[in-house]
Amino acid sequence: MIQITVVQIDNYGPWTVTPNPRRESDLQALQSRLYCDMNLQFGAHKGLAFYTRFDNIIAITNGIDLETHKRIQNSVKNRYPFTVSMAVASAETAYEAQKLATKTIQEYGSAQDDVRKEVLDVANEFVSNGYVQLAHVDINDITGKLTDLETAYDTYLSVQKTKLKLMEELKKYDSLGFFIGGDNFMCPCNGMNEKDFLCMFEDIKDSCGIELKAGIGIGKTAEDASNLADIGLEVIREGKTDSQVYTLKQEIDEQKNVPYNYMCPI
């Protein structure tokens, strides 16, 4: 089981134009700061956040309890000119978990409802014995094939086309895909295997002409899984395997319950 938290800014659209439209550079900086904060605060408890649309953030939160969510929510209220709502859900796949979490927030009203503030709810249950599977995907030799040859914008366009195709293919497996900078994508993919990725990469190569590789990490938390995925990708980059997909799994001994202060100050 994977645990997902959906974070949504309350009544954000109307706030950006009240009493007058706010300066765009300030709004962009504010959104980026919130995303940074969510990664730092969830990351302090071994979670991982993705910006999606900036006013809606998706986080992997295995091992993070309700009280910690509340502390993060209060921290936003104390330091930002708006509040956020949060819903937590767990499921066998990342797509299903975020679907349940999104539905839970939507049941409280519209994202632009001025009376809906600081929702904090749990769709089903908190994960105690689940796991997180993450794939760190990147483009083969983007520097030699795109960055050093094409314009900055054309390279960006190629990366965005690849991202869209990757996201569409991942959704077929009830998995998610997020752009994390450069030519890199992080994909919550509980339930997928190496063969699934190889088939998917072949389809993307045929349609986009882009070759991909992936390190897959399986761990107790998002931090554990992402670290292993990063190591797996380095194994491929260093030519230590012939495959374009390499999986590393956290050892059982490492997953035993150990004291961890989930309630530490944020």
UniProtKB/Swiss-Prot annotation:
It comes from Methanococcus maripaludis (strain DSM 14266 / JCM 13030 / NBRC 101832 / S2 / LL). Its EC number is 3.5.4.29. Catalyzes the formation of 2-amino-5-formylamino-6-ribofuranosylamino-4(3H)-pyrimidinone ribonucleotide monophosphate and inorganic phosphate from GTP. Also has an independent pyrophosphate phosphohydrolase activity. This is GTP cyclohydrolase III. It comes from the Archaea. The gene is gch3. The keyword tRNA processing does not apply. InterPro entries: GTP_CycHdrlase_3, Nucleotide_cyclase, Rev_trsase/Diguanyl_cyclase. Signal peptide: none annotated. Keywords: GTP-binding, Hydrolase, Nucleotide-binding. It holds the Pfam family GCH_III. It is an enzyme of class 3 (hydrolase). It catalyses: GTP + 3 H2O = 2-amino-5-formylamino-6-(5-phospho-D-ribosylamino)pyrimidin-4(3H)-one + 2 phosphate + 2 H(+). GO terms for molecular function: GTP binding; GTP cyclohydrolase IIa activity.
